[in-house]
């Protein structure tokens, strides 16, 4: 029994040793079997028309097809491989799909002027050098899913007839899509950019920048979005420019973060512009823009952030006045347009507050003259016609003021009559000084009816004050009725 246990222990130790020794041998075997293919061999296959299929190989040398005549009609599939030298396929035409999924390009890549009739697969590709894809024609789907660009890249003036997929792609340096055209879906969701430019780029289908992050300057100048575009959850950490851009469908900027100035000057939104819960740490410039329906519900603005609506034309702008009242750049036309907008939304309190601030700022900026004096009177008396409380205050103040004057100055007497009360009767006799209640009652009567109560009459100079109070009463009561009608009857 002891002998059997001893042999079992020996066999177990031999098994463990063999397994431990086999592990590095296996890794070494994998490294040795990674095939190295010369670029000349691939060029020969391409020229001869042979199908090109490689996986997990290392391609040495420079891969150039500058002298190739005609198009490449064979399928080309090189996946999970490493290109050590530069790759140049300038002006090449690929009739069949090109699949370079998972490859790594150590040097520069040039596909300038290429035509991909069957689509191009660059999913998971890493470009460690510069990537030149200018004037490229993608006839089918162009997939750059999770592609990484370590140096500058350019898709300038490229045509995307199929879907353009840049989902989860990363651009560590500058990239431009200037004058490019996307006829169908364009997806940049979860993409990462430093400096990116979409100058006069045209997006014909649905476009998505969902959760994209722009760490540098993002330029969408004169960009045309024919369909809906989604920037939901995106972050613009430096400047963002959408000047002269046009949005033909829904523009979704929900929960977007703008760290610097967001410039939409001259932009055109023909459908709903949705900025709900957006955050602006800089300014929002909508100068000269055209807005059909813009929603700014629950937006977050810094204390020094400004909103510029100068010369903006908007049909419907949904944002509460309390959110923008201290941040709106003053422009008379913009304020009056906002007043009209609030009235159409039936936000009458917001309309009144907006109009009040418009008049107040205009009054402060106006030079001294009759116009400014009339504005001061309008401000103090009725709050430019939108503050009925101002007029009510002056009514009560006038009554109380004159009541105190009449009482404190002994400016009125109260007469009593023995027997019948007859005007001018010799039996009328003055009593002692009137009480404050009687003086206040007299002031109310003069303010509302301009007629003194029976047996109460001002004396001396106070008769003129009573007449003045009657005139002020007619003025303030008439003003009160007008302002109250304007506030209550919409």
Name what the model sees in each region.
Residues 1-8:
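Bacterial N-terminal signal peptides that target proteins for export
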Residues 8-18:
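Bacterial N-terminal signal peptides
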Residues 22-375:
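N-terminal leader/targeting and pre-domain segments
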Residues 336-339, 469, 485:
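Short, well-ordered alpha-helical packing segments
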Residues 348, 364, 402, 411-414, ...:
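Intrinsically disordered or highly flexible coil/loop and linker segments, enriched in small
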Residues 370-388, 415-472, 479:
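Pore-loop/selectivity-filter region of tetrameric P-loop cation channels
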Residues 388-410, 471-482:
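Selective detector of the "anchor" transmembrane alpha-helix that sits immediately C-terminal
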Residues 404-420, 483-490:
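Juxtamembrane/interface segments at transmembrane-helix termini
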